[in-house]
Amino acid sequence: MPELPEVEVTRRGIEPFVAGRRVERVDVRTAMLRWPVPAGFAEMLRSREVLRVERRGKYLLFEVDAGWFIVHLGMTGTLRVLPNDAPPPAPAKHDHVDWIFDEFVLRFRDPRRFGAVLWHPRDAGDVHAHPLLASLGVEPFSAAFSGALLFGRTRGRTVSVKQALLAGDIVVGVGNIYASESLFRAGIRPTTAAGRVSLPRYERLADAVRATLADAIERGGSTLRDFVGSNGESGYFQLDCFVYDRAGEPCRVCGAPIRQIVQGQRSTYFCPNCQR
């Protein structure tokens, strides 16, 4: 599943192409995604100029003068920039939506159709008040994200610290791979109750989350089976993981075998020696 680094890599790859360019037309081939593509979506965007592309959590927000179209990649979705030949490149089975510009096509592909393409009109207020965005936690690269925030929001919580990171109500974008890697960097065992982690340890964890996500973005995102960047190249952060998907292999710091457990139906990896 594309997480924050994959979505940010996609945003950075796409924005230079689309910002300041007009959508000539939109072809919606499959309206039934996770939520239906709004009726009249293609007509609403015809001849609209894309002003900018933002990211909120795992949502991409494309601003035009009349509002925003919102794209969520779901579990297997990708956005690709393709040359706009005459005619445009023929769509494949899972290519559901095309935004056609003068020189290129922005194509949304999603084999499992858990992604979404939505519309938020400007007269409905700021896009960040959209029901899917309003309850999200803070951005990990924002000034609001800190060890003090993690500490304060987890007092009395018995859920594990890893599950608290994944929940998304405190901080967004820390998916399964990045939670395991961040906890390793911070030296915190993932099974520790969130409410029992001290403020100094949460300060280390906040720093580790930012560093882990920044490294992933720099390296192009994780090599998830279904993730492909906007230029068609797979990311490769997973090749540098300290613990994720390395069960039984020696820890790169101390040499102890990496352990694998299941938390909330997801695999967790940690070093029993480095993480306490």
Curated annotation (Swiss-Prot):
Reaction equation(s) it catalyzes: Hydrolysis of DNA containing ring-opened 7-methylguanine residues, releasing 2,6-diamino-4-hydroxy-5-(N-methyl)formamidopyrimidine; 2'-deoxyribonucleotide-(2'-deoxyribose 5'-phosphate)-2'-deoxyribonucleotide-DNA = a 3'-end 2'-deoxyribonucleotide-(2,3-dehydro-2,3-deoxyribose 5'-phosphate)-DNA + a 5'-end 5'-phospho-2'-deoxyribonucleoside-DNA + H(+)
Xref: Pfam families: Fapy_DNA_glyco, H2TH, zf-FPG_IleRS
Write out the residues that bind DNA.
H94, R112, R157
Identification of the protein by name = Formamidopyrimidine-DNA glycosylase
Q: Which PROSITE patterns match?
A: FPG_CAT, ZF_FPG_1, ZF_FPG_2
Q: Which organism is it from?
A: Burkholderia pseudomallei (strain K96243)
Cofactor(s), by name: Zn(2+)
Q: What is its EC number?
A: 3.2.2.23, 4.2.99.18
